[in-house]
Amino acid sequence: MDEFKQLDLKKREIENRLNELEGVLLKERVTMDTPLLTEDGFPRSDIDVPSIRTARHEIITLRNDHRELEDQIKKVLEKVFSGFSKESLAANDETKLAQEADPLNFNAANYNMNDIISRSKILGRVKPFCVVDSVAVESPAQEAGLCIGDELVHVQNVTSLSELPTFISNNVNKTLDVLLIRGYSADGSTNLVELKLTPHKWQGPGLLGCHLR
């Protein structure tokens, strides 16, 4: 596990540095794609162009390093857990489930959709947890604007497909913030969309009227 700890430490250091660089972009109110030149081809005078360029370059480099570290960490963990028996893994899963928090809180203190969107647009570090592969006509999902192919990133503070059914059942007729990916730009960055979803009974089955996988 020493190797894992070293890799995890490096990963956290990179994430801290990315947050600092993200602050530079947030301060200048720009993203990774905001034009830095005027229509005449001159550097814009309303922003700190040199600082932004430096931050962007370092962000790109660190994002690549971060992905490589995640791959290395995954391989290390696979080696560690490969020695466990199925029985011990099952026991670990049960322990983990028992230690998890109570049903997700609708007003979680650490949840802030605007902050998530701002940070995600700048660094593009969003990871969807499921994909919409069908939407029924006149369903709550269609009312909210969900489309086939949408990749869900957050439903309020839920980021796990296994937790979503219980959360939806506990929040019937409540308006939930949804952050999703709807396609990708030419440079590979995500197109983020924010929707309002209200689970409720309708003429079809379920509370959403869509299928997720």
Swiss-Prot record:
Domain of life: Eukaryota
Pfam families per the UniProt record, alphabetical: Nas2_N
Entry's Gene Ontology BP terms: proteasome regulatory particle assembly
InterPro entries referenced in this protein's UniProt entry, alphabetically: Nas2_N (IPR040815), PDZ_sf (IPR036034), PSMD9 (IPR035269)
Coiled coil: 1-82
UniProt keywords, alphabetically: Chaperone, Coiled coil, Cytoplasm, Nucleus
Entry's localization field: Cytoplasm; Nucleus
Residue ranges constituting the PDZ domain according to the UniProt record: 120-184
A Gene Ontology cellular-component term: cytoplasm
Key word Protein biosynthesis present: no
N-terminal signal peptide: none
Its job: Acts as a chaperone during the assembly of the 26S proteasome, specifically of the base subcomplex of the 19S regulatory complex (RC).
PANTHER family, sorted: 26S PROTEASOME NON-ATPASE REGULATORY SUBUNIT 9
Name of the protein described by the UniProt record: Probable 26S proteasome regulatory subunit p27
Lineage: Eukaryota, Fungi, Dikarya, Ascomycota, Taphrinomycotina
Gene: nas2
